[in-house]
Amino acid sequence: NWRLPCAGLSFVDYFAQRPSALQNTVHRARKKLDRAGIGKVDIHTQQGKFLDAAISAFESIYQRSWKPAEAFPDFVRRLCVLAAQKGKLRLGVLSLNGIAIASQIWLVDQGKAYIFKLAYDPDAARFSPGSLLTAALMEHVLDFDAVDEVDYLSGDDAYKQDWMSHRHERHGLIAFDLATPRGLLAAARHYGGKKRRAWRAGEAT
């Protein structure tokens, strides 16, 4: 995963260290958004009358995005409510002319910011809404929360490297005790499932 040690780092200094391509993308996107109408970023951190609407905006954008459907959609809503109760939520919503076009869920705890969920409306892709909102939330956690580290959590997506500075590899290990019935059954389910997925993928191509 990708992370950013950032103790004492201001957003201005942080952004100056980003690749020039990313800086240009954000600058151009801001100009495009300004020309298109009224762009606004709201960052929700506490419970209140606007939180439910912000969560609904995230859910709506997520459904319109390229992301696969949530297996447990109610989990995200409950997590946001709980995190807001504890002051750990940073739910950002970027809107254009009153219509939400991007949303991200960050969580802040014990000096670390975790980028948990993000999505944007594909119809608004020309505005680079994901980059604009990431920049806004990064500014918030660096200058307001003064976190010591930002963590992009799992995934090695290329775009994460533009925002982070350190790459941390994680390797998983799974083992089965084949001398026991339970171990044999678990192994059969695991490897049988892998073969079934591979077979289905072959059929789809």
Task: Please identify what each model-predicted range represents.
Residues 1-11, 17, 145-205:
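Active-site/acyl-donor-binding loops of N-acyltransferases
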Residues 1, 27-30, 66-70, 118, ...:
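Glycine-rich loops and low-complexity Gly/Arg-rich segments
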